[in-house]
Amino acid sequence: MVSVPTGLRPSAVPGVRLPALADQVGAVMAGPDRRAAVPDVTVTGVTLRAQDVLPGDLFAALPGATTHGARHAAEAIERGAVAVLTDAAGVAQLTGGRTTPTLLHPRPRSVLGELAAAVYAHPSERLTVIGITGTSGKTTTTYLVESGLRAAGRTAGLIGTVGIRIDGADIPSALTTPEAPALQALLAAMAEQRVDTVVMEVSSHALALGRVDGTRFAVGGFTNLSRDHLDFHPTMADYFEAKALLFDPNSPLRAHRAVVCIDDEAGREMAARAGDAVTVSAEGQPAHWRAVEVAPLGTGGQQFTVIDPAGVQHRAGIRLPGHYNVANCLVALALLDAVGVSPEQAAPGLLQTRVPGRMEEIDAGQDFLALVDYAHKPGALRAVLSSLKRPDRRLAVVFGAGGERDPGKRAPMGATAAELADLVVVTDDNPRGEDPAAIRREILAGATESGCAAEVIEIGDRRAAIRHAVAWAGPGDVVLVAGKGHETGQRTGEHTRPFDDRVELAEALREAVGPRKAQG
């Protein structure tokens, strides 16, 4: 029975003396005498959130976008924090007669990962950690790797966008992209649960913002690179460089071994940067791992022959459509091989892999294919629609674009949808603080300017948009609801209402199937 302590922390932490931590990260005592001795207290946890503090914690008071964490130091201390780490601006905001030791560092976030790793006894060194980065395919590849590990008898942990899993059990958590202290605590909890191998998604944000600092990666995997997160990264080059931190020989985050898909130019550049990468290709590139003889498998699945670095052939199959998922599977197989799991050991697990909200089929007995997918950027949308487009059937796509995210991808997504689908229903995604109608207009402009013959309509209400596409579909057609995947809420302004594309699509299908059967 898998259990995880409250707060996704280990239940037993020996602790580290505060003077040793200060020496390790180059912090000094705040106050007029920077050479003052650091009090000899024991730290047993680290957190950024005052409300998460447990007795014995060090509270990291960091500068934020709108406020400074030091404003919450008093609450943290009241909850049992034995020390505070902050910068000069934070020290200036601390109130009261400060009896709790306060460490000063000019860039506290930059040392937080290593500090937390030390407090939790360097958990990644007690585990085999596999990190997967790339624009698309991270979630699918982590699930494939987890399935392969478990098929080989390994006790696996998974950390990613959809959630956290330990030995196949879902662990409730809001930690989609854990900050460094939460990640180190989680890894320590997994080690305590006797997990031996952890596979985790590693986003560009996590790499650039230090969220994986202190983590030692046994293997790093790269899937692909296309436009995304340009609201955070100023250029695609900057985006690439963030991903490269997992592979560059000069990076402190560099994985011990690298697996890189070279089916796009960024992958080939990443392999060259890594220097000694194991390469994979599903597109005929000369690579260590290749896929050939790809053929359909059942409804929506694929089977293919894998050629390994020694030239040995293996049969593999996945219950996931789309040629890009063949590439994801190759990355997974190469990563598994790097940690001692053979294709034959992994194959049964790969064949059973289901990924929440990733090309997830919704079947209510209808006579057409209905899918939900997380594709929310131009490259991913193109890959998904291309995999579904066939001359013998019509294709409908329902999608929108997130507010307060890279606006430059909206028109290209509209153009891509109009090029590849027969019906394009532009709707709301997560508008957040933006005007939903304005977001839709940008998508519609791209679709209109593409000059394609698709029928393009606008239905802002996502529930109604899904029902329109379902009503449109006929026997053998395909309906894809894209953009939100596994998400269970829709955010407008500051309010998030319950909304799950999978639930809504299933309800729409059930409503439609009854009348159709009656007519039949």
Swiss-Prot record:
ATP binds at residues 134-140. One of its GO terms (cellular component) is cytoplasm. Its EC number is 6.3.2.13. SUPFAM superfamilies: MurD-like peptide ligases, catalytic domain, MurD-like peptide ligases, peptide-binding domain, MurE/MurF N-terminal domain. Carboxylation is probably crucial for Mg(2+) binding and, consequently, for the gamma-phosphate positioning of ATP. One of its GO terms (biological process) is cell wall organization. Its main location: cytoplasm. Keywords: ATP-binding, Cell cycle, Cell division, Cell shape, Cell wall biogenesis/degradation, Cytoplasm, Ligase, Magnesium, Nucleotide-binding, Peptidoglycan synthesis. Meso-2,6-diaminopimelate binds at residues 405, 429-432, 483, 487. Disulfide bonds: none annotated. A motif (Meso-diaminopimelate recognition motif) lies at residues 429-432. Catalyzes the addition of meso-diaminopimelic acid to the nucleotide precursor UDP-N-acetylmuramoyl-L-alanyl-D-glutamate (UMAG) in the biosynthesis of bacterial cell-wall peptidoglycan. This is UDP-N-acetylmuramoyl-L-alanyl-D-glutamate--2,6-diaminopimelate ligase. The gene is murE.
